[in-house]
Design a protein with these regions (language model features):
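Bacterial N-terminal signal peptides that target proteins for export
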Residues: 1-11
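Bacterial N-terminal signal peptides
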Residues: 11-20
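N-terminal secretory-pathway/extracellular module detecting exported/lumenal segments
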Residues: 21-85, 89-147
Length: 147
């Protein structure tokens, strides 16, 4: 599914990451550990792939994985997902985040069938606030920290 065709689905998926979080103590990721936990709530945990950090113009781009405690409803009726892999763009100066790509998987840790896909072109990115102490905020803080 292309997000431009159904922006409501994209916004609802993004809303799942705007929940308050308890900050996870950051530990350095090793070469064998692709995903590094950065945020955890009662219903989800967010991970980043440090090797995916890249500058795209004035923005930082990074891959993230989210595991949900309970299955989340997918756009397709009767389908649910328990994990997502996304490519986010971050505007560090404005504390904004936009989702470039998203794949939702039936099981945790990106396992099982892909039940939903979304992709947005650079000109159609929907920028959302990334307040501190939310999943988006923690993802942005990780992406934007000086290296």
């Amino acid at each position: 599914m292309v997000a431009a065709r159904n922006p409501a689905i994209l916004v609802s998926l993004l809303a799942l990451t705007a929940l308050p979080v308890s900050v996870v103590a950051e530990e350095p990721a090793t070469a064998t550990d692709k995903w590094h936990s950065v945020a955890k709530t009662d219903n989800q945990e967010a991970f980043v792939n440090p090797a995916s950090l890249a500058m795209v113009g004035a923005f930082v781009e990074m891959r993230a994985k989210q595991n949900f405690v309970q299955p989340q409803p997918a756009a397709k009726k009767g389908k649910t997902f328990q994990s997502t892999r996304a490519v986010y763009r971050f505007d560090c100066a404005q504390r904004k985040v936009a989702m470039k790509e998203l794949r939702a998987y039936a099981g945790p840790d990106l396992q099982g069938d892909t039940v939903q896909k979304a992709k947005t072109g650079d000109r159609n990115l929907q920028w959302l606030d990334a307040p501190e102490s939310t999943v988006f905020g923690e993802l942005l803080d990780y992406a934007c920290q000086p290296r």
